[in-house]
A protein has these predicted regions:
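Short, well-ordered beta-strand elements
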Residues: 23-33, 51-57, 126-127
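Pocket-flanking alpha-helical
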Residues: 61-92, 114, 198-202
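Periplasmic-binding protein-like
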Residues: 100-110, 135-144, 199-239, 241-262
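Ligand-binding "clamshell"
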Residues: 86-98, 111-115, 187, 192, ...
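Short helix-initiation/N-cap motifs at beta->coil->alpha
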Residues: 56-66, 155-183
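A conserved helix-loop-strand patch within extracytoplasmic ligand-binding domains
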Residues: 98-149, 247
């Protein structure tokens, strides 16, 4: 009898270990804020669905895509489709969107030491903007949307400062990495900042901006995967990130600075 009980216990433990090890592991690269925070909120939901999520945080826009292409990541979460498409074209990568999760509206922020409103921006003001193709275009689009400059009508989604057709206030543009714009703000008059980088820098993204980009051009941030990778666990990842639980987490945590696509 004792041997039978021991055998039964052994089989039960073996079965339990088998169940635990049956969970699929997903390694996802992400920017710290809000992407990694949103993934952390999704972790327990994914675990219930048999997926163990490992999050690797990056502080740049290049390595997450290179490591995904190389197979070191299963997916990444930090970018919008225009950036992804431009990256593919520039680097020969083969990455696609598996689904959209949220928007990060861009805002025009003022150097904290200066009292500047949208109507009182001085002529010759220095404005820091992101230097990557798609975010620079978005930043310039924000300035045009708010009547500060005019762009060449043929510039499209790849506009740079060279495509500024009218700059009546003679603004001086400083192009830096998107993540560096908040740190540059103290050295310029204004900066156009992605809300995720504003959040990381501790900037008040709800009350501080004096202008926002048009909601019609705010690009959704996506889960990127390798072309042809249609594993069910990746579909589940997207489904969870678009679920009511995560939508509520985003709304309650970021108060409009990050907006769910659903």
């Amino acid at each position: 009898m004792k041997k039978l009980l021991t055998l039964a216990l052994s089989l039960a433990l073996t079965a339990a270990v088998g169940v635990a090890s049956a969970n699929t592991k997903l390694v996802v690269g992400a920017s710290a804020t809000p992407h990694a925070e949103i993934l952390e909120a999704a972790k327990p939901i994914l675990a219930e669905k048999g997926i163990d999520l490992e999050i690797i945080v990056f502080d740049d826009y290049v390595q997450p895509n290179l490591q995904l292409e190389a197979g070191d990541l299963d997916a990444n979460y930090f970018q919008h489709i225009p950036y992804l498409e431009d990256f593919n074209a520039q680097n020969g990568t083969h990455l696609v969107s598996a689904g959209a999760v949220h928007y990060e509206p861009m805002g025009l922020y003022v150097n904290p030491a200066k009292a500047i409103t949208l109507d009182s921006i001085p002529d010759g003001a220095t404005i820091a903007i992101p230097n990557d193709t798609t975010n620079e275009s978005r930043a310039l689009g924000l300035l045009e949307f708010n009547g500060l400059i005019k762009l060449d009508t043929e510039a499209g989604q790849t506009a740079t400062v060279l495509d500024i057709a009218e700059n009546p206030h003679k603004f001086d543009f400083v192009e830096v990495e998107a993540a560096q714009v908040p740190r540059t703000l103290a050295d310029v008059d204004l900066g156009v900042i992605n809300s995720n980088y504003a959040l990381q820098a501790g900037v008040d993204v709800v009350g501080t901006p004096i202008a926002y980009e048009s909601t019609e051009v705010a690009y959704p941030n996506i889960i990127a995967v390798r072309e042809g990778d249609d594993r069910e666990e990746l579909k589940t990842l997207v489904e969870v990130l678009q679920s009511d639980e995560i939508v509520n987490f985003i709304n309650e945590t970021y108060k409009g600075a990050v907006v769910p696509t659903k």
